[in-house]
Structures are given as C-alpha cells and as structure tokens.
Amino acid sequence: MVGYDPKADDRDISNVEVAVAGSVSGLVTRVLISPLDVIKIRFQLQIERLSRSDPNAKYHGILQAGRQILQEEGPTAFWKGHIPAQLLSIGYGAVQFLSFEALTELVHRASVRDARDFSVHFLCGGLSACVATLAVHPVDVLRTRFAAQGEPRVYKTLRDAVVTMYRTEGPLVFYKGLNPTLIAIFPYAGFQFSIYSSLKRAYEWALPAEGKKNGNFKNLLCGSGAGVISKTLTYPLDLFKKRLQVGGFEQARASFGQVRSYKGLLDCAGQVLREEGAQGCFKGLSPSLLKAALSTGLVFFWYELFCNFFHHMRKADS
C-alpha cells in the first residue's frame, strides 16, 4: 500500500529504501514513455490547430507526428533531453514518495483522521509533489528545452544548455513556469494518490477473491486509471506550463510554426483561449492520456514492487 497504514505489516522499510524504490520506479518508467512525452510536448507548443485541415500545422496526430519526427530527426529524437529527464524522474520519484510516506505518517500520529482517507491522500500527495517539484524544476526546464528544439540543435549537451541559458537569460530561467507548475501539480498529484488508493479499495471490494491475488496487475490497472482521471482534470495547466517554459526560446521554435511570447500564467491562458479556443487548452491530450496511463500505472507498479521486495528481504534476514 502506498502511504502510511498502521494495520499493514509490509511497510517496515527504511527511508533510504523508500527513496530507492521511488527513484527506480521513475527511472524505468521514463525510459519507456519518453517517445510519448516528446510528442506530447511538440503538440502542446504548436500554435496551429492539430488538424489535417490546417495546412500550416506541422503535427496533427500521434502516428503522423511520430513518423515525421522519425523522418526528420531520426529515432534518437524520441529520447531528446533524456539525461535531464532521467535526472528529473530519479530525483522527483525519490523526494515525492519519501515526502508522501512521511506526511501520511505525520497525519496519522498528529490527528484522529485515518491516514488512508481520500482527503488525506489528496492533501499529502499534492504537498509531496510540490516539494519534489521545487527540488527538480530546473531539470524540468532543461528537459522541455531539449524536447522542444528541432534541427539544427541549439543545445548540443546538457552542460552547453545550462551555460547558454544562464548566460543569455539569467538564473531565473531555470524556474520559468514554476507558478503554473505548482498550481497544476498539487491537484494532479493529489488526485493521483487519492484516486489510486480509492480504485484499489474498489477493486478489492468488487473482486474480493482477486483482490488478494494478482497484486501487481491490480497496482498497474489502478495506477493507470488514476493517471488518466488526474491528467484530464488538470491538463490545461500543464499546457500553460510548457508554453511558459519555452519563453525566450522562440528562435529555435520557428521551424515548427508560429511562436508566441507570454508575460505570465494569466496572459498565457488568455492568449491561448483567444487565438486557439477552448480546444487549444487540450492540445496534446491524446498522447498525454496515453502517457499518463502508462507512466502512473508503471510508477505505482514499480514502487510497490520494490517496496515489497525490500520488505521480503528484511523478513528473510530476520
């Protein structure tokens, strides 16, 4: 079970083991879903409609975008920014799960509320994600820049990107899009954790015999469902965040179509609604939902798997 549960006997693991489980779950998942992430970011940053009817649109569908990126930039393009993305996943996973476990235990010890309640998991999930975001946001900006650039590349290496961005845009460039990120990540992660635990309980109630078995499949299925629901509810804020993160990067974006500059979150939201309509707030939703289903399902699957592995190792040693 993710989160503190006083009745569970399978969470007698150390903070280091929790951090390792969170890190590895993020690392493995990132390798698998990186191509979808690149396509999603390209969709989010495209001003033109994602439609065949718009002659100026570079991308209009997942398969078409995948083929075009492959033809123009080669297979490695699907792992553009993979090093910063992996640093992001490893650091974020460790901090988020460690914070979540600590916060749910704190709630249990400091109040009479059940640490497994939907509201407790929502609040602790949101707060743990905010802590993790503050820790790794500069890496997220780097990942977005790498995934957004076409050919020829503006940044050749991670070091080149850090030096160039710092020199041309100042230190605050590494926290571009932080406000919408925090605003978006709190409800997104809150829903992820709370819906995941709720779906697991619903699964065990609906299939009591199966609920005790096939734990790995249950974790994967419930994690995927939680990812899809959470992403749908909070998607527009994720799009605004991506648009803000590539501010000052307009020249490298010119080959992809129109570019825009935004003064902040409200200005970004206003421009998107005026120029692209309400549907503009959901550009890239399809690959995002597919990515959310895979990534959230896999993250919870791997996290629970590694936690159980550490638990059984301790049990065998005792």
Swiss-Prot record:
Q: List the disulfide bonds.
A: none
> Which spans are transmembrane here?
19-39, 87-107, 122-142, 173-193, 220-240, 293-313
Name the GO cellular-component terms. mitochondrial inner membrane; mitochondrion
Q: How does it sit in the membrane?
A: Multi-pass membrane protein
- Write the record's keywords in alphabetical order, separated by commas: Antiport, Membrane, Mitochondrion, Phosphoprotein, Repeat, Transmembrane, Transmembrane helix, Transport
Q: Which GO terms describe its molecular function?
A: antiporter activity; thiamine pyrophosphate transmembrane transporter activity; thiamine transmembrane transporter activity
Provide the protein name.
Mitochondrial thiamine pyrophosphate carrier
Q: Which organism is it from?
A: Bos taurus (Bovine)
Question: Which gene is transcribed and translated to give this protein?
Answer: SLC25A19
